[in-house]
Amino acid sequence: MPGKIGKVVQVIGPVVDIKFDSDSLPNLYNAISIDMGERTLIAEVEQHVGDDIVRTIAMEATEGLKRGMDAVDTEKAISVPVGDKVLGRLFNVLGKPIDNAGEVEAEEIYPIHRPAPSFKDQAVEPEMFETGIKVIDLLAPYQRGGKIGLFGGAGVGKTVLIQELINNIAKEHGGLSVFTGVGERSREGNDLYHEMRESGVIDKTALVFGQMNEPPGARMRVALTGLTMAEYFRDKGQDVLLFIDNIFRFTQAGSEVSALLGRIPSAVGYQPTLATEMGALQERITSTKNGSITSVQAVYVPADDLTDPAPATTFSHLDATTVLSRSIVELGIYPAVDPLESSSRILDPRLVGEEHYNVATKVKNILERYKELQDIIAILGVDELSDEDKAVVSRARKVQRFLSQPFTVGEQFTGMPGKYVSVKETIKGFKEILEGKYDDLPESAFLFIGSVEEAVQKAKSLA
């Protein structure tokens, strides 16, 4: 049975005002359906204006919308399909498939606005999550069921790192992933979809996209669509990986919507509700006694300024941060993870073990010392250093290069097969470099290899 019917009275871009009878106003966050002949437009109620008008934000383009059109209150929030049927498929913010592979016959449909799990349902048993990427596993390990921020400016490799993580998790752990593209390039989304089909990880992944060209309403809500699909798997006892690329675009879309709704902007022009909106999303990403959601969120840093309110608000929710640095890109080292800026709450001897903690600390110390010596080297040259400092510089440069790694998803561009390196192998490799076992090998032998044994082989081929 159709719900209450109203009339469109004003359309300003993606903002649509609809008049209902004053005794039958739709609730906030209800989905409103407007039949436009060739298609149905869905809008979400954001404000009640006066006694009988609701202000809504359209989830699709409003071209062709006219005043006087009928608008039907669906009497529920935007709801999306969940369950095994969503795996291997590509969706938009409304949970409609956009991969031309037919309808999705899901057993259940969940609303995208849901409460966060209660405290008594949440589980906090810190446990390390192996990614197979050396620099991450050693220096800023991820927590199972934690939130990880991937920070970096434009073009430093955030999306490639996310693709490699999806690949490693599916192949090594057999885990399910939900990838949410929030306000990013459609071309990248298309490439990701086809690459995942070719590599065979698509069957373990659901993809949800609200890309750059879509209205702000879609970009603001698409993260919730992906999260809702992930929550279902978690509640059924699965360990799920939720990728959000890019969480900054979620904030950006919220800022656009806030301005369109006439709210007075806050610091740097962001919405006054920035912390609340971010909290509502992040509090739902958590582990329960049934299963876990581990989320990896790419965070675009405007003008590389980490004090900007958008990345700064995101920081407060994270368990680990992986910072990608342009200065490391300039050295030709990929993944361009900054070993000194990246951090993790679980890099603790009680959680990762004494050996792991000690090796990670020594690696950071030697890189710090190398950083201090670089000024002296720039002015006086390496020859003026003491023998002890020369050994530090030599080992630090090897460590720096050993932090690089060839990725499976980059194979077609680099021609190098990707490498998955276990935590045990990673710790062993760095420990031996620090002990001076490979002092006689050239530093180029450590660039783009997996385990440390490969450096010996590479050195022979370079000789």
Swiss-Prot record:
Q: Which GO terms describe its cellular component?
A: plasma membrane; proton-transporting ATP synthase complex
Cysteine-cysteine disulfides: none
Where does this one sit in the cell?
Answer: Cell membrane
Q: Per the UniProt record, which EC number(s) apply here?
A: 7.1.2.2
Sorted UniProt keywords: ATP synthesis, ATP-binding, Cell membrane, CF(1), Hydrogen ion transport, Ion transport, Membrane, Nucleotide-binding, Translocase, Transport
UniProt keyword annotation of Nucleotide-binding present:
yes
Q: Does Nuclease show up as a keyword for this record?
A: no
> What is this enzyme's class at the first EC digit?
translocase
Q: What Pfam families does UniProt report for this protein, alphabetically?
A: ATP-synt_ab (PF00006), ATP-synt_ab_N (PF02874), ATP-synt_VA_C (PF22919)
Xref: PROSITE patterns: ATPASE_ALPHA_BETA
Major localization listed first in the record, in broad terms: membrane
Domain of life here? Bacteria
Catalytic activity, as annotated: ATP + H2O + 4 H(+)(in) = ADP + phosphate + 5 H(+)(out)
Q: Where does ATP bind?
A: G152, G153, A154, G155, V156, G157, K158, T159
Tell me how this protein sits in the membrane.
Peripheral membrane protein
InterPro entries, alphabetized? AAA+_ATPase, ATP-synt_VA_C, ATP_synth_F1_bsu, ATPase_a/bsu_AS, ATPase_alpha/beta_chains, ATPase_F1/V1/A1_a/bsu_N, ATPase_F1/V1/A1_a/bsu_N_sf, ATPase_F1/V1/A1_a/bsu_nucl-bd
Job description of the protein: Produces ATP from ADP in the presence of a proton gradient across the membrane. The catalytic sites are hosted primarily by the beta subunits.
Could you describe the subunit structure of this protein?
F-type ATPases have 2 components, CF(1) - the catalytic core - and CF(0) - the membrane proton channel. CF(1) has five subunits: alpha(3), beta(3), gamma(1), delta(1), epsilon(1). CF(0) has three main subunits: a(1), b(2) and c(9-12). The alpha and beta chains form an alternating ring which encloses part of the gamma chain. CF(1) is attached to CF(0) by a central stalk formed by the gamma and epsilon chains, while a peripheral stalk is formed by the delta and b chains.
**Descriptive protein name:** ATP synthase subunit beta
